[in-house]
């Protein structure tokens, strides 16, 4: 299976659909952002949040080169504050960023989850690839008033386009 189709398969499996508004938290250079923006289409919106200006610049160049106009970049200082209104997104991607490297303290991760909870519509999902802390992440997310709805296991793409078997956990608000 080619790289791009594996990414699309994973995103569709976690619930991304045409017309949705999705936040890719810690989007990096856009491995999942670009395909997610293609799935949500022109009626949808993809917020790409990262603290690295260079990777956001790269992401926006890629988006422009493929004609995508539905991606909005969001630079952050790394604080767990998301500059979106309450109940404004249908889904949040939290792929390989919810771990102690980026958020060393449990309280930091809890503040991130509280912000995500705030911006999620009542029916929204949060999709987490807890690459570096699988069991701990599940417990922390459930303790933040989310419940595990489903799991997706398949080939996922990591830094430098490395393919690896992984598991994505999908949660919803309680």
Predicted feature residues:
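Short alpha-helix
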Residues: 133-145
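A short acidic, Gly/Pro-enriched loop at the edge of an enzyme's catalytic core
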Residues: 79-92
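Core SAM-dependent methyltransferase catalytic element
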Residues: 145, 157-174
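Conserved beta-strand signature within the Rossmann-like core of class I S-adenosyl-L-methionine
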Residues: 123-130
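Conserved alpha-helix/loop element of class I SAM-dependent methyltransferases that forms part
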Residues: 2-20
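A short beta-strand submotif of the Rossmann-like class I SAM-dependent methyltransferase core
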Residues: 94-97
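A short glycine-rich, Lys/Arg-flanked "PGG" loop and its adjoining helix->strand segment in the class I
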Residues: 37, 106-122
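Class I SAM-dependent methyltransferase SAM/SAH-binding core
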Residues: 23, 29-80
């Amino acid at each position: 299976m080619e790289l791009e189709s594996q990414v699309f398969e994973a995103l569709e499996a976690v619930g991304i659909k045409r017309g949705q508004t999705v936040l890719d938290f810690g989007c990096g250079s856009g491995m999942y952002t670009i395909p997610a923006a293609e799935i949500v289409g022109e009626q949808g919106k993809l917020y790409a949040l990262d603290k690295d200006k260079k990777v956001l610049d790269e992401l926006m160049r890629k988006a422009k080169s493929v004609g995508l106009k539905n991606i909005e970049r969001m630079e952050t200082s790394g604080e767990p504050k998301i500059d979106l209104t309450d109940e404004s997104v249908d889904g949040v991607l939290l792929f390989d960023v919810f771990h102690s490297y980026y958020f060393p303290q449990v309280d930091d991760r809890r503040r991130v989850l509280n912000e995500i909870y705030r911006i999620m519509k009542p029916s929204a999902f949060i999709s987490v690839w807890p690459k570096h802390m699988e069991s701990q992440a599940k417990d922390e997310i459930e303790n933040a008033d989310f419940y595990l709805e489903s799991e997706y296991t398949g080939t996922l793409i990591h830094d430098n386009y490395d393919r690896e078997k992984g598991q994505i956990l999908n949660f919803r608000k309680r």
